[in-house]
Regions:
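Aromatic side chains
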Residues: 51, 236-239, 282
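Structural motif
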Residues: 177-179, 274-276, 300
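Soluble periplasmic/extracytoplasmic beta-strand elements of cell-envelope proteins
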Residues: 179-181, 235, 278
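Short His-Asn-centered micro-motif
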Residues: 157, 182, 280, 304-305
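Gly/Ala-rich beta-loop-alpha elbow adjacent to hydrolase catalytic centers
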Residues: 278-287
Length: 412
């Protein structure tokens, strides 16, 4: 969230200027110039091509884009040794394959990360690159090494371009409820986690939410037979977010691409567990676009610091999930005009009365990047949604009915 962490007033004016620039671009050059993206071959695509051309035990491998249920059936038909063999042959493909067992994806992505470390280490030593290029390679190498820590569970990894990653906190197979954190702009492998302002980065957000959900569950319910609270949280930085405040940040293209990926992830989660989405900033645009196509297992969509959800009101999202919204009083995004004109802007403010969301307190969040900070009412509310303890939610000031028809569903 690099751009959204800087001076509020500066960002407000820069966003308004960006809106004007986009309109000029669309009028003079059309969508093509604004949306042009490099189409170079990339590591993940090469891996998928190899999978497509590969054979296993004399038979063609299933389409990597097949429905997750079909892929799950394929992997279930194999022995453990056969599954590991495929992960070692095609680590990037298997590691990003919805339908593959989570533990197999973790294993495949460890192999892919190890290979990516080798690539970046060679780039660090390549003096044909600029100093800046070698420094970036060094940062990427250390990020990949961090993700290789034995206790980390990487569900998706793509080193292409700015990079994408998704990580699981908790036991995804045993969890009764799963929370998915969907971050906003400037999210990539380098900004995925931070030492400074830890809880403004996807990894920090998800880890903070996981700890808060465990605390909520431990404080209100008996533990499960295993002795551990049955929740899991996914830090989902597995879409290409807008880079900075510009054309992509004020239009829906990145959100539309991300929405497909988000829906695929949710459908592929093992078992029949319920899912809650936590959508921050531009991530709320992704969640808004995806809402209509999400499966019914998604029971809650909570947005924080939202520029809009590409809908005039909550009903227009077309989902049966409960829609929650919050915004800290010091969040600069509240100063951005909520509009949608010629595809620019993201529509009605989700915390406004006319939108019709259930508005929650965000006390203590202290601006745009603080919603997942420990000790805030925003994080406490997120955690209560995550464990299904709706009757203990704290509504926004001036309201007392945000949870009036939401029954607690927490179970051991």
């Amino acid at each position: 969230m690099t751009s959204f962490d800087s001076s509020p007033q500066f960002n407000v004016w820069r966003t308004l200027l960006a809106l004007a620039i986009v309109l000029v671009m669309l009028a003079t050059s059309g969508w093509t110039a604004a949306r042009h993206q490099r189409g170079d071959t990339n590591p993940l695509q090469r891996a998928l091509n190899a999978w497509s051309d590969g054979r296993f035990q004399g038979k063609a491998l299933p389409d990597a884009d097949a429905p997750s249920a079909k892929l799950a059936g394929f992997f279930a038909s194999l022995s453990r040794a056969q599954r590991l063999d495929l992960a070692e042959r095609y680590p990037l493909a298997v590691g990003n394959m919805n339908g593959a067992p989570p533990k197999l994806r973790y294993r495949a992505n460890r192999i892919a990360l190890e290979e990516a470390v080798v690539v970046e280490r060679e780039r660090v030593r390549d003096h044909r690159l600029s100093t800046e290029g070698r420094q970036e390679a060094d940062r990427r190498m250390h990020r990949f090494l961090s993700l290789l820590h034995p206790k980390r569970h990487v569900l998706a990894f793509d080193p292409t371009g700015r990079g994408r990653v998704a990580e699981v906190f908790g036991n995804l197979n045993r969890a009764a409820r799963v929370s998915v954190v969907v971050p906003g702009i400037d999210t990539d492998v380098l900004t995925y986690e931070r030492t400074y302002r830890t809880f403004s980065a996807p990894a920090g957000m998800a880890k903070s939410l996981y700890k808060a959900e465990r605390a909520q569950r431990e404080g209100s319910l008996p533990r499960s037979a295993s002795g551990a609270p049955r929740v899991a949280v996914i830090a989902w930085a597995d879409y290409t977010s807008p880079a900075g405040i510009g054309v992509d940040a004020v239009t829906a293209k990145r959100a539309e691409d991300g929405a497909v990926r988000l829906s695929d992830l949710v459908r592929s989660l093992p078992g029949k567990k319920s899912v809650a989405l936590y959508c921050h900033s531009y991530g709320s645009v992704v969640c808004g676009v995806s809402a209509r196509d999400l499966p019914s297992r998604v029971t809650d969509i909570a947005v924080a610091g939202s520029p809009g959800m590409r809908a005039a009101n909550a009903a227009q999202l077309g989902t049966g999930a409960r829609i929650w919204a919050m915004r800290d009083q010091d969040d600069w995004i509240g100063q951005i005009p909520n509009l949608e004109l010629a595809g620019v802007g993201h529509g009605t403010d989700p915390v406004s009365a006319e939108f019709g969301a259930r508005v929650l307190s965000a006390n203590g969040a202290a601006g745009h990047a603080g919603y997942f900070e420990p000790g805030t009412e925003s994080l406490d509310n997120f955690a209560r949604i995550g464990v299904g303890a709706y009757q203990t939610l704290r509504c926004a000031a001036g309201t007392n009915s945000c949870y009036h028809d939401a029954e607690d569903v927490v179970s051991a």
